[in-house]
Regions:
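Active-site-adjacent loops and short helices of periplasmic peptidoglycan-processing enzymes
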Residues: 11-169
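C-terminal segment of classical bacterial N-terminal signal peptides
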Residues: 2-11
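Generic detector of short alpha-helix boundary/capping microenvironments
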Residues: 2, 20-21, 43-44, 86, ...
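Domain-terminus/edge residues, biased toward the C-terminal soluble/receptor-binding domains
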Residues: 136, 147-152, 156-355
Length: 355
């Protein structure tokens, strides 16, 4: 059985999406994955040090922040650096700050070697994680992002990676840090939007001769978190600021379904009550523009049979827009319903008395 429960939303006036100087770019809502604007979003390109988003994630999943790591001579790579010295001992957490703030290639090599016993094995884990996240246009060949054959991604994949990474509390904390003291070093974050753009909470810069300037950032205002990615973009700072101004002006985060809110009644057979209230098992938010409508419909059995427990999933809410399904949310019993005691027939009562 399907019934319409409707949701119609109002939003800010329509805005025009900005143009950028990027070879490829995307602006995506982190919560729903909706692409708000973009160009060449699935074009495979070099991504430079934005690679280190994945490096940090794999390190967090395979190592412990308090691990003691000894720097080896072969960890001291070319390019951006946190200026490690062979024989130096740091914690994995300190290396992660060196990885994400000054974009240390030496930190990347050291982390990879420690967490997997070798860079090749670590890179294999990076690719396994990319596959698990649905990054179908991505291939990693090293943990730093230095130009290497077979090392590439696309704007869409990097946005998905960034959205996932920012849900990891330790990653988000480090990515949002402007400066950090690591021993005698004072590390500064290369992401200058942290200081200049309202609501910016991360993420990662990059540059190589082949990739050009690459930038992945995250910005949050009024509960809506957006991710911007630009690849090969000389004007990336200004372009990211313009993308966010567009995104927050043209879209509003609307709650289509509220967790715990009761949506409908369902008949119950064999229970102590004839019906039960059904509520949403979780909330669902979606960014919408002016004139866009979210439709919520319920799918549930014709009849439920007691006993039922509070929180038991018995149906689902379907959220759609313009005929496209966006999400399914469980409908759960808002209260328990016990089974009614079975009434004895006259024959059963007589049998009990004579038996």
């Amino acid at each position: 059985m399907v019934c319409s429960l409707l949701g119609c939303v109002d939003c800010a006036a329509a805005q025009s999406a900005p143009q950028t100087g990027a070879e490829a770019f995307i602006l995506m809502d982190a919560g729903s994955g909706r692409v708000l604007t973009g160009k060449n979003t699935e074009q495979e390109l070099a991504i430079a040090s934005t690679t280190k988003i994945m490096t940090a994630l794999v390190a967090l999943e395979t190592g412990n922040l308090s691990d003691k790591v000894t720097v080896k001579q072969n960890h001291l790579k070319e390019g951006s650096s946190m200026y490690l010295r062979a024989g130096e001992v740091l914690t994995l957490e300190e290396l992660l700050y060196g990885l994400l703030l000054p974009s240390g290639n030496d930190a990347a090599e050291c982390i990879a070697d420690h967490c997997s016993g070798g860079v090749e094995r670590f890179v294999a884990r990076m690719n396994e994680k990319a596959a698990a996240l649905g990054m179908t246009h991505t291939s990693f060949a090293n943990p730093s992002g230095l130009d290497t054959q077979g090392h590439y991604s696309c704007a869409l994949d990097m946005a998905r990676l960034a959205a996932y990474a920012m849900r990891e509390p330790t990653f988000a904390r480090i990515a949002a840090t402007r400066t950090a003291a690591v021993g005698e070093r004072m590390l500064g974050n290369h992401n200058k939007l942290l200081a200049s753009l309202e609501g910016c909470t991360g993420l990662k810069t990059g540059y190589t001769d082949n990739a050009g300037r690459t930038l992945v950032t995250c910005c949050e205002r009024d509960g809506m978190r957006l991710i911007a990615v630009t690849l090969n973009d000389r004007s990336d700072w200004a372009d990211h600021a313009a993308l966010y101004e567009y995104g927050f002006a043209a879209f509003a985060r609307k709650r289509a379904v509220a967790r715990g809110e009761e949506y409908t009644l369902a008949p119950v057979r064999g229970g102590t009550q004839a019906s039960v209230s059904l509520a949403a098992g979780e909330s669902f938010f979606y960014p919408v523009t002016a004139g866009e409508e979210l439709l919520v419909s319920a799918r549930l059995p014709e009849e439920l049979t007691a006993p039922l427990t509070a929180g038991q999933a018995v149906g689902e809410l379907i959220v759609s827009m313009d005929g496209e399904e966006l999400a399914r949310v469980s409908l759960v019993c808002a209260e328990p319903v016990a089974a009614a005691e079975k009434k004895q027939s006259l024959f059963e009562r007589l049998f009990d008395r004579t038996g």
